[in-house]
């Protein structure tokens, strides 16, 4: 095979793959595809310098990764507002009509899988990032390349983010679980969990075996170049992605409802799990003008399918103890399948809820589950009672430590700070992402450390040694070193993270940041009146903080000595042009972005990750891209780095 013949054969193989994996319309037999595939592999092994990066043979890497890197989306991946019935749909559409009486809409299926953001530059796939928190996700490019329905190259030279859902067909999901059962591995709960787990494999060869599909649903960066969302969908298909099924262009509420009815009627027959329909204002310019709330875009919503109801029997009630000591009753159910997931437990929330609904042990109960939502018990089927049902009694003593419980409003609490369950939950929270972010210290590891008496409180984490860890089952030197390094890496962490990590009731991430910026280390010595002076703090938060500081004075002092959190008191300059303004940064700047953000925050600015009509300034560097274009289209003031520095130093 000559080099020219090789490139021709690669194009033929790509066409075969596209028709088989994307269009589901094979143009060659499996034998023909495999034969050509192996011919190309042999040529590439003999001529590695001539390999075409877009060849289907290059989708699976040879070397597994050790961990996932973080990656920032060019445009934020937002959550959508939910509507659940026709009345709520009408209310949502009427809000759009107030601004745009002639508005039209694009409707598409809401796939039940794992969201993925694909970045293409100069027509090449350069990164694939999970949704994460919407701003930053995990880089899974090596796995995305194994998904045959994701093009490695597209005929589009501008920078663009193609977004979609990674899914597994219902039939393929059954085969995966059958294989796992034969290998004595734990089963996936549903196709969504299987897709998400497959996407996060460190070894791409495992991902490649899972028959993942990519179903596109939108565009991030680059959307501003289109006039219509419907047009954008058609462009995505022309670029080589899977056609969007049940795509509808709707001009009225009635046509939206009709599209929903069609989709709902096909829900069970369609090979991929669906959990609703996405409704999007079609005109892109109108989308930009409507903008976003703190959580979601104003121009789109998810019209969810009704929650699936099933009945099951309450076999017993177990009690969970949280880090704040609150006892949560959990119903242990006779297993029942709902939407492809086996449900055997459902929260009962609290004992007041049990009394209000008159739920009893042995009751047949109605359970609902919608999408990712934790299963809920709606009501008992009273007519089916046969006299064997028993009242669910409130506990008087902690199920873990045996201490007497306190009844506080609707909650029942264990007050023993040394209770095993409270200690374990508090350490899990302490190590979590929004707290000290100790990589590798998750729930299973914390329980293992506690059961082996290596930790009895948060402080004990910092006394762990590699020698101790190596005595535990499943631990090797590299893993032990990584955990000790991650723990030591928390020394000097930002004060707000330290406050949040303590798990003070009613004091979350936002409150922790305010306290750290305003009071510094004095936060642990505050009077009630001082806390109440902070904007947004009520009596419940203030009492909780004062009581926690008093009860844990020694522990806080010891942790401060070990961790030495970084104190950054924020002195606001309210005379600056950026005071109380919303700023977006884009492009490559000469100074570290964190330094510029800190400087802007010291001037009272609010930093945003996306451009909308509420943005006051966009500060841009080299290769600014779509955010700068969007700002210019909305007539937002834009400043290059030199202009920004001149303004901020006035």
From Swiss-Prot:
Q: Does the keyword Zinc apply?
A: yes
A GO molecular function term, named singly, is:
DNA ligase (NAD+) activity
Cofactor dependency: Mg(2+); Mn(2+)
Q: What does this protein do?
A: DNA ligase that catalyzes the formation of phosphodiester linkages between 5'-phosphoryl and 3'-hydroxyl groups in double-stranded DNA using NAD as a coenzyme and as the energy source for the reaction. It is essential for DNA replication and repair of damaged DNA.
- The enzyme's main class, written as a single word, is ligase
* Family per similarity comment: Belongs to the NAD-dependent DNA ligase family. LigA subfamily.
What top-level branch of life does the organism fall under?
Bacteria
Q: Name one Pfam family in it.
A: HHH_2
What is the E.C. number?
6.5.1.2
Binding residue positions for NAD(+) = 30-34, 79-80, 131, 165, 304
User: Catalytic residues?
Assistant: 110
- Which of this chain's residues are annotated to bind Zn(2+)? 398, 401, 414, 419
Kindly provide the name given to this protein in its UniProt entry.
DNA ligase
What are the BP-aspect GO terms?
Answer: DNA repair; DNA replication
**Do you know which PANTHER family this protein is assigned to?**
CHROMOSOME TRANSMISSION FIDELITY FACTOR 18, DNA LIGASE
InterPro entries assigned to the protein according to its UniProt record, in alphabetical order:
BRCT_dom, BRCT_dom_sf, DisA/LigA_HHH, DNA_ligase, DNA_ligase_AS, DNA_ligase_CS, DNAligase_adenylation, DNAligase_N
Task: Pinpoint the BRCT domain residues.
Answer: 573-650
An example of a Gene Ontology cellular component annotation for this protein is: cytosol
What's the catalysed reaction? NAD(+) + (deoxyribonucleotide)n-3'-hydroxyl + 5'-phospho-(deoxyribonucleotide)m = (deoxyribonucleotide)n+m + AMP + beta-nicotinamide D-nucleotide
Q: Which UniProt keywords apply?
A: DNA damage, DNA repair, DNA replication, Ligase, Magnesium, Manganese, Metal-binding, NAD, Zinc
């Amino acid at each position: 095979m000559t080099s020219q013949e090789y490139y021709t054969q690669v194009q033929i193989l790509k066409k075969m793959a596209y028709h088989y994996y994307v269009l589901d319309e094979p143009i060659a037999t499996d034998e023909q595809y495999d034969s050509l595939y192996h011919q190309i592999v042999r040529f590439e092994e003999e001529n590695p310098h001539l390999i075409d990066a877009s060849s289907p043979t290059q989708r699976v890497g040879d070397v597994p990764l050790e961990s996932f890197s973080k990656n920032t989306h060019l445009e934020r991946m937002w959550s959508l507002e939910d509507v659940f019935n026709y009345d709520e749909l009408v209310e949502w559409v009427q809000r759009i009509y107030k601004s745009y009486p002639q508005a039209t809409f694009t409707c598409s299926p809401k796939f039940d899988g794992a969201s993925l953001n694909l970045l293409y530059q100069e027509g090449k796939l350069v990164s694939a990032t999970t949704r994460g928190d919407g701003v930053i996700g995990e880089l899974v490019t090596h796995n995305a390349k194994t998904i045959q329905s994701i093009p490695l190259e597209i005929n589009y030279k501008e920078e663009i983010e193609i977004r979609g859902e990674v899914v597994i067909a219902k039939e393929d999901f059954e085969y995966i679980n059958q294989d796992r059962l034969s290998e004595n591995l734990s089963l996936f709960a549903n196709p969504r969990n299987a897709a998400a787990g497959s996407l996060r494999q460190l070894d791409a060869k495992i991902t490649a075996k899972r028959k993942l599909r990519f179903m596109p649903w939108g565009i991030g960066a680059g959307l501003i170049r289109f006039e219509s969302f419907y047009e954008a969908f058609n462009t995505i298909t022309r670029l080589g992605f899977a056609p969007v099924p049940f795509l509808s262009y709707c001009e009225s509420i009635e046509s939206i409802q009709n599209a929903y009815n069609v989709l709902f009627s096909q829900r069970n027959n369609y090979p991929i799990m669906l959990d609703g329909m996405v409704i999007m204002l079609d005109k892109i310019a109108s989308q930009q003008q409507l903008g976003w709330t703190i959580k979601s875009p104003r121009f789109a919503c998810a019209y969810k399918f009704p929650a699936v109801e099933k009945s099951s029997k309450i076999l017993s009630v177990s009690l969970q103890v949280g880090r704040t000591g609150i006892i949560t009753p959990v119903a242990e159910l006779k297993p029942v399948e709902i939407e492809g997931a086996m449900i055997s437990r459902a929260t009962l929330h609290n004992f007041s809820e049990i009394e209000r609904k008159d739920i009893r042990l042995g009751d047949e109960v109605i359970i609902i589950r919608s999408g990712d939502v934790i299963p809920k018990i709606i009501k008992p089927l009273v007519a089916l009672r046969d006299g064997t049902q028993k009242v669910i009694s409130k506990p008087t003593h902690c199920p873990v430590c045996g201490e007497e419980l306190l009844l506080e409003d609707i909650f029942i609490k264990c007050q023993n700070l040394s209770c095993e369950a409270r200690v374990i939950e508090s350490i899990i929270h302490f190590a979590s992402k929004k707290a000290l972010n100790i990589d590798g210290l998750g729930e299973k590891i914390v329980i293992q450390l506690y059961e082996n008496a290596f930790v009895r409180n948060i402080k004990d984490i910092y006394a762990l040694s590699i020698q101790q860890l190596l005595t535990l089952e499943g631990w090797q030197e590299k893993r032990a070193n990584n955990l000790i390094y991650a723990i030591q890496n928390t020394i000097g962490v930002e004060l707000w993270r330290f406050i949040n990590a303590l798990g003070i009731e009613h004091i979350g991430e936002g409150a922790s940041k305010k306290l750290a910026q305003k009071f510094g280390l004095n936060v642990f010595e505050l009077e009630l009146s001082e806390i109440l002076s902070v904007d947004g703090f009520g009596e419940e938060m203030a009492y909780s903080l004062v009581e926690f500081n008093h009860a844990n004075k020694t522990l806080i002092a010891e942790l401060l000595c070990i961790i030495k959190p970084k104190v950054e008191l924020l002195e606001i300059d309210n005379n600056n042009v950026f005071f109380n303004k919303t700023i977006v940064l884009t492009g490559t700047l000469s100074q570290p972005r964190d330094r510029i953000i800190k400087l802007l925050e010291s001037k009272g600015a609010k930093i945003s990750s996306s451009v909308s009509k509420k943005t006051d300034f966009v500060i841009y560097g080299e290769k600014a891209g779509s955010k700068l274009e969007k700002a210019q289209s909305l007539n937002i003031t834009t400043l290059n780095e030199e202009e920004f520095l001149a303004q901020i130093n006035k």
